[in-house]
């Protein structure tokens, strides 16, 4: 990866972190910090797709899909409240992944949002197809998210 790509990944990590930080309350931020610490490791032990399945299963999309799509569509998260539940922290981590994929043009944002709303299985199938590319490119970004969470979210 070139130095320019690395810088773009770090910049995207800061943007995504800022969006989820503002969309979560204090309790959910603490839970998100745990997700950021654990999920990056899980992706590289179990693989991207199995970990993604787990994250999706925990994100509560059946009740909160509109919040996730609003966050993906929004240039700012000021008016979006993901809540304080465990689901909110998983949804925030799912957002971080999907934000990277759309902003780095690995997957089209309109396709992503459409499939989140209408056909998650088709989205998962597309992500499975792209998983070798995703796995090779996303690690630095997720490590930056992890470090930001560790540095900026205090846990009692």
UniProtKB/Swiss-Prot annotation:
BP-aspect Gene Ontology terms: defense response to virus
Family matches, as Gene3D superfamilies: AF1862-like domain (1.10.520.30)
Tagged with keyword Cytoplasm: yes
Principal location: cytoplasm
InterPro entries noted in UniProt: AF1862-like_dom_sf, CRISPR-assoc_prot_Cmr5
Alphabetically ordered keywords of this record: Antiviral defense, Cytoplasm
Assembly, per entry: Part of the CMR ribonucleoprotein complex, consisting of crRNA plus Cmr1/Cmr2/Cmr3/Cmr4/Cmr5/Cmr6 at 1:1 and possibly 3 Cmr7 dimers. A Cmr2/Cmr3/Cmr7 subcomplex without crRNA can also be isolated. It does not cleave target RNA.
Homology family: Belongs to the CRISPR system Cmr5 family.
NCBIfam families documented for this protein: cas_Cmr5
UniProt protein name: CRISPR system CMR subunit Cmr5
């Amino acid at each position: 990866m070139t130095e320019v790509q690395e810088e773009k990944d770090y910049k995207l990590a800061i943007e995504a972190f800022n969006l989820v930080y503002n969309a979560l309350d204090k309790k959910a931020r603490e839970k998100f910090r745990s997700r950021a610490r654990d999920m990056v490791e899980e992706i590289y032990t179990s693989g991207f797709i199995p970990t993604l399945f787990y994250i999706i299963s925990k994100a509560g999309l059946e009740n909160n899909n509109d919040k996730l799509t609003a966050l993906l569509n929004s240039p700012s998260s000021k008016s979006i409240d993901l809540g304080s539940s465990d689901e909110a922290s998983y949804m925030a981590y799912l957002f971080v992944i999907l934000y990277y994929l759309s902003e780095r043009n690995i997957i089209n944002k309109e396709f992503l949002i459409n499939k989140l709303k209408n056909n998650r299985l088709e989205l998962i199938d597309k992500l499975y197809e792209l998983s070798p590319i995703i796995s090779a490119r996303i690690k630095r970004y997720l490590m930056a998210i992890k470090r930001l969470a560790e540095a900026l979210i205090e846990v009692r």
